[in-house]
Amino acid sequence: MDFKLFSIASFFFVTISCSEKQTPTDLTTLVQPFGIIPSSQNGYGGGLDQLAQPDDVEILSDGSFVVTDVDNNRIQLFSSDGSLLKSVSAKNLQLPNQNIIPTGVATDGDGFIYVSLEGVGRIARFTSELIFDQFIGRPCSVSAENYYRTENDGCLISPQGIIVAKNGDVYVIDMAKYVFMKNEVRNFGFRKFYQSTKSNKTVYLYDRGFAQSQEITTIMRKSEGMTISPDQKTLYLAEEKPEKSQFGNLKKMRYIAAFDLETGRFLNRLFGVSVKNDSIVEGVFKKAVEGISVFEKYLFAVDEKGGKVVVFDLRSGSHLGSIGRLAYYYCNKESDCVIDGVNYNEQNIIAGRAMPHLKNDWRKNEMASPDGISAITLDDGSRILAVVDQWNSRILLYDLSKILRNFD
């Protein structure tokens, strides 16, 4: 596919404007979280009240939370008050490889939970009580050239991002970097499994037709965050590491792209960037867009390097505002940030020499590399937003109504 925009500028969601009416609202000092998970937080680690580089979160309709705890190789179920209810590891799944590396998590319309297990090339399906139901997909080790061959239908190398439609169809990103990279240009594999019934049992079948029609792996280069529109017609993906060749994107601005859920074809819609002369010239996101979530008429997106959550109008694409600030006591593994004699980089956090969760104030929305996100209306009618505050080793919880009243 040619990435030249031709005449689709009129379809673009231009989100940067000098208009006073469209100036985004910063909610960082206006709205604060009402709580965190774990509620008795103890920072980075493997304890019951600890998380170690959590990646994603999914809010269940009863107000409980599922968290993928990556460095601990476990899936955690927390109650609505932030207490640990259950933990699932390789042993519980009867897998010999302890490094299951759980990453993405999603739910379907019937409340089943789906978790991508990057380390073992599978998707695990659970009941709403986190009781194991079945695996979806099978592990494999194949080349990019052979990935879509018939004999490799449904196999997975390193599944990460996942989203599930209400009808149970599963969409997963196979982020095997060194398999799909060509000439230093990144790409990934993409699979859809559709739900079916065989002998009165729920089964998942690989959708070869979707694989043949989808344009996702042509338009995108590195993605993990995905979400589906309320009408179950549009699939949204976040671009983490774009190339200059994508839409004349010389500044490599990050964006969110829209695709048809049934066919995977590109819908000529981008969020988070502005266009001039058929090229992307500016963008909202600092350096990385991670988790995304749709709620009613809003699209929420995590700006990882900016330490905040960005809000868009789903229909117009307008950039409405954001919440969060980059945590002072944190820098990534490639940096050093020595403060009062302590280096708050990721290596020191893992080693226990730095404890940013004690320094960064969650009540002030100070986020250290936020990642996954989830938004939902609970069974009791309350509306909740959850954000993974990765290197502060916690999940931030917001009253979604307090956020949205600023945009309604």
At which residue positions do the language-model features occur?
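A short helix->beta-strand "capping" segment at the edge of beta-propeller domains
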Residues: 22-50, 354-359
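Conserved beta-strand positions in repeat-built beta-propeller and related beta-rich domains
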Residues: 67-71, 115-119, 155, 172-176, ...
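Beta-propeller fold detector
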Residues: 24-40, 85-91, 132-147, 200-215, ...
